[in-house]
Amino acid sequence: MAARCPVGVASVLLLIVLVTVASAASGARSGGGGGGGIRELRGGGAGRRVGGRTEVRDVEGDREVQELGRFSVEEHNRRRRSRDCGDVRLEFGRVVAAQRQVVSGLKYYLRVAAAEEGAAGQNGGEPRVFDAVVVVKPWLESRTLLTFAPAADSPNES
């Protein structure tokens, strides 16, 4: 009887391995567009790469995104002041576009419109467009401005 148990266990293990391999092969075939990345299924079976950027819909109505835009301008002003880079401050206008990416937290790529305070700046007080990247870690109640710079394709930049 002892000789039959290992054969039964071996058969079960072999079956588990075969099912796992078949399942993995089936998933790789149906994963779509190459890249071999992990995919997240959404309605209708269409997948997207986990960790990829997604557009934020209704940016102007998204209070969190608008607040992050305001935070990015305030933080930029604070950093300029601490480096003694002059008195020119930006005044937040609005976030005009945003993308969200899941990292260890949420990374927001924001396109922010802001004007120089005191309207008589070098561009006559016209809003300028800036790109900002902010990381939010809600469980730590933390927001960090990573970058803030004039948008490369902004028509108001000289």
Curated annotation (Swiss-Prot):
Cystatin domain: residues covered: 51-116
The family this protein is said to belong to: Belongs to the cystatin family. Phytocystatin subfamily.
Compositional bias ranges of the Gly residues kind: 29-49
UniProt GO molecular function: cysteine-type endopeptidase inhibitor activity
Site residues (Reactive site), renumbered to this chain: G51
Motif Secondary area of contact, residue range(s) on this chain: 101-105
Organism (species): Oryza sativa subsp. japonica
Transport in keyword set: no
Protein name per UniProt: Cysteine proteinase inhibitor 4
Primary location class: secreted
SMART domains: CY
Region ranges (Disordered): 26-51
SUPFAM superfamilies, A to Z: Cystatin/monellin
Transmembrane feature ranges: none
Highest taxon above the source species: Eukaryota
Secreted among keywords: yes
Compartments where located: Secreted
UniProt-listed GO biological process terms: defense response
